[in-house]
């Protein structure tokens, strides 16, 4: 009997449920860019929490320093380039009403975003 890590089992289930090549090339590229941006998005998420906490605790100097770090992440040319490409791909994948044209694209992208969210913790 083969024993898999729970996350591997979930990934295998998604692979089994989704035929190979079922998502569009735009969705594949979107997912690849999400993977590249995952560390930056995780850092931004943590900084947002730290900024909110610093503001609530009235640690103005800390909040200002954290906002500067956040702004520095946004100024990175590679990050900016990738995020602009994501916006273009999102427009192509979207049906104009907030949903994906292809439900399998939405499912694959959503899965990637959930996995990234939980890896960030």
Where are these regions (language model features)?
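Bacterial N-terminal signal peptides that target proteins for export
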Residues: 1-9
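Disulfide-bonded cysteine motifs in exported proteins
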Residues: 3, 37, 114-115
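Compact alpha-helical subdomains of small soluble proteins
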Residues: 67-121
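Extracellular/secretory pathway and lumenal proteins
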Residues: 11-12, 46
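Immediate post-signal-peptide N-terminus of mature secreted/exported proteins
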Residues: 21-64, 118-120
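N-terminal signal peptide c-region/cleavage motif recognized by signal peptidases
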Residues: 17-19
């Amino acid at each position: 009997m083969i024993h898999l890590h729970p996350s591997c089992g979930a990934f295998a289930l998604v692979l089994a449920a989704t035929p190979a090549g079922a998502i569009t090339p735009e969705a594949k590229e979107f997912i690849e860019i999400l993977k590249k941006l995952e560390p930056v998005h995780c850092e931004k998420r943590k900084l947002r929490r730290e900024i909110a906490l610093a503001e609530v605790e009235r640690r103005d100097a800390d909040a200002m320093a954290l906002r500067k770090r956040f702004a520095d992440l946004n100024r990175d040319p590679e990050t900016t380039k990738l995020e602009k490409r994501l916006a273009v791909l999102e427009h192509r994948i979207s049906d104009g009403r907030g949903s994906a044209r292809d439900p399998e694209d939405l499912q694959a992208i959503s899965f990637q975003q959930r996995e990234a969210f939980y890896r960030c913790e």
